[in-house]
């Protein structure tokens, strides 16, 4: 089988490539150049797009004895990930750029190019498993990345390979060291790669500009003015620009955002609790949409917990009733449905949250 391996320059994708070689496949490594402007992408850790990371990936490919290329996806990445991220925040949403990157870059644009060039599959260093075409959590639940892959269609998954999903992260590092890969001790990073400063508010402000509005409490009283709703997210407690806690002495949190009026609503932590979610553009990883309510577990953050729920498809949208309330759920987040079985937690599907009540 001809396999294209997406090599970020980190330890995970490096071991994934090595395992594909060991399995006897015809392997080619590729690194995606996601920016042409120096200093615009985070480097030195678990990067996926810097010159330093490309160099690390090339050195691993040399050790493995496989061809290696760098493909320029900068324009596509800007349009489908960065611009989407900015526009989503301007609408008062809270997107996950890693979800969007997997959906539109790695397993759409990159996978399509791979198939067009005659490759049979795209392998990555994601912590997830595929068994009988079913997407499942990784063995290492602490590193599991099935959440950010839950937007993939059955057709996209049919051409995907996740070689390290059955191995805990410490063992991956040990394996890399045994293989003599210099990235064995390379640090992980959980930051947004295209915000090198780590200051999301400043990044968004520079691109959206000042759009003044008000911060109001449950009575409608104006507590403060702000420079744009992009500086806030549901559940936020710090950096609200308000004088202090509420009249009862309890902290106040962002409970709602109205991008059209520029109004940021704040209230008590109990106001953050929701018991139902509405998801747009649902994707079912099996390729088959359920025709009846489904008992499942729901996760709304990449490294968040799950709660039991019932999900039902109605008029093209996913309606989810939670058995236990969740706090701080924001429009723009991805909701992922899981189902437990003897082979591990299976991903049923996902949707983008449009409302939480």
Swiss-Prot record:
GO cellular component: cytoplasm
Pfam family, one: tRNA_Me_trans
An example Gene Ontology molecular-function term: tRNA binding
InterPro entries assigned: MnmA-like, MnmA-like_C, MnmA-like_central, MnmA-like_central_sf, Rossmann-like_a/b/a_fold
Residues engaged in binding ATP: 6-13, 32, 125
Keywords on record: ATP-binding, Cytoplasm, Disulfide bond, Nucleotide-binding, RNA-binding, Transferase, tRNA processing, tRNA-binding
Listed EC numbers: 2.8.1.13
Reaction(s) this enzyme catalyzes, per UniProt: S-sulfanyl-L-cysteinyl-[protein] + uridine(34) in tRNA + AH2 + ATP = 2-thiouridine(34) in tRNA + L-cysteinyl-[protein] + A + AMP + diphosphate + H(+)
Cellular compartments annotated: Cytoplasm
GO biological process: tRNA wobble position uridine thiolation
SUPFAM superfamilies: Adenine nucleotide alpha hydrolases-like
HAMAP family, per database record: tRNA_thiouridyl_MnmA
Family: Belongs to the MnmA/TRMU family.
The protein, known as: tRNA-specific 2-thiouridylase MnmA
Species this chain originates from: Mycolicibacterium vanbaalenii (strain DSM 7251 / JCM 13017 / BCRC 16820 / KCTC 9966 / NRRL B-24157 / PYR-1)
Gene: mnmA
């Amino acid at each position: 089988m001809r396999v294209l391996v997406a090599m970020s320059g980190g330890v995970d994708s490096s071991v994934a490539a090595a395992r594909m070689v060991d399995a006897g496949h015809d392997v080619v490594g590729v690194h995606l150049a996601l920016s042409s402007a120096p200093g615009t992408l985070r480097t030195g850790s678990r990067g996926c797009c810097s010159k330093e990371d490309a160099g690390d990936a090339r050195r691993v490919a040399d050790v493995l004895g496989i061809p290696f290329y760098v493909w320029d996806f900068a324009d596509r990445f800007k349009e489908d990930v960065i611009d989407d991220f900015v526009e989503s925040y301007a609408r008062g949403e809270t997107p996950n750029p890693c979800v969007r990157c997997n959906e539109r870059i790695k397993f759409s644009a990159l996978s399509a190019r791979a198939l067009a060039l005659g490759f049979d599959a795209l392998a990555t260093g994601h912590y997830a498993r595929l068994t009988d075409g079913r997407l499942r959590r990784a063995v290492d639940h602490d590193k599991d990345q099935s959440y950010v892959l839950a937007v993939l269609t059955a057709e996209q998954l049919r051409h995907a390979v996740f070689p390290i999903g059955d191995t805990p992260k410490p063992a991956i590092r040990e394996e890399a060291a045994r293989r003599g890969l210099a990235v064995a001790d390379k640090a992980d990073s959980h930051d947004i790669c295209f915000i090198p400063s780590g200051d999301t508010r400043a990044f968004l402000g520079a691109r959206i500009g000042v759009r003044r509005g008000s911060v109001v409490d449950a009575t409608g009283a104006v507590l403060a003015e702000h420079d744009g709703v992009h500086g806030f997210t549901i559940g936020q407690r710090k950096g609200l620009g308000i004088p202090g806690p509420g009249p009862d002495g309890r902290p106040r949190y962002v409970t709602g955002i109205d991008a059209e009026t520029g109004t940021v609503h704040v209230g008590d932590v109990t106001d953050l609790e929701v018991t139902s979610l509405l998801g747009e553009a649902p994707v079912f990883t099996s390729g088959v949409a359920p025709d009846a309510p489904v008992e499942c577990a729901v996760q709304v953050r990449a490294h968040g917990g799950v709660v039991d729920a019932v999900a039902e498809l109605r008029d093209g949208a996913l309606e989810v009733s939670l058995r236990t309330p969740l706090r701080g759920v924001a429009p723009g987040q991805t909701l992922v449905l899981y189902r437990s079985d003897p082979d591990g937690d299976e991903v049923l599907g996902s949707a983008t949250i449009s409302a939480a009540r």
